[in-house]
Amino acid sequence: MYLFKKIGAALLLTSTLVLASQVQADVRIDIKNDSSEDCSVAFNARVDKTKWLTEGWYVFVPGEEGPVILKGANDVHDVFIYHDCGLTPTDRDEVKRAWVKVNLKFSDYLPKENEKDYQEVQFVRLNSPAYTIGNRK
């Protein structure tokens, strides 16, 4: 009986560890709009080794602060951001091009290259879980 309890406990622990390793984390990004305009924000995030999620639009009015939760993203360093309030990458920024839906909310796991109502934009890699629109130096 003791042996069965030990085997059962080992199986339970193993199955718990396997399930925990398969669960995807979510990434929280705190956005603050320091500009004088309403700003629409989109994200391009790695959700596993070969898949990317492109999602938008999150609209922030001037002075607004708030979190965005990217479901399935595992690491903030695998997240790129785009916004329509004068995002100009610097020489030290890592950039990535992706397609966003024009003027409509979207969540895409497949590239939408040259599809109707989509345009290609340049995203910038996030360096931290907090991002301020405007006053970029």
Kindly give the residue locations of the regions a language model identified.
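Bacterial N-terminal signal peptides that target proteins for export
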Residues: M1-L11
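Glycine-centered signal
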Residues: M1-Y2, V18-Q22
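Short, intrinsically disordered low-complexity segments
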Residues: F4-K5, T16, D91, K96
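Bacterial N-terminal signal peptides
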Residues: A10-V18
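Intrinsically disordered, low-complexity segments enriched in small/polar residues
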Residues: S21-D34, D38-A73, F80-K137
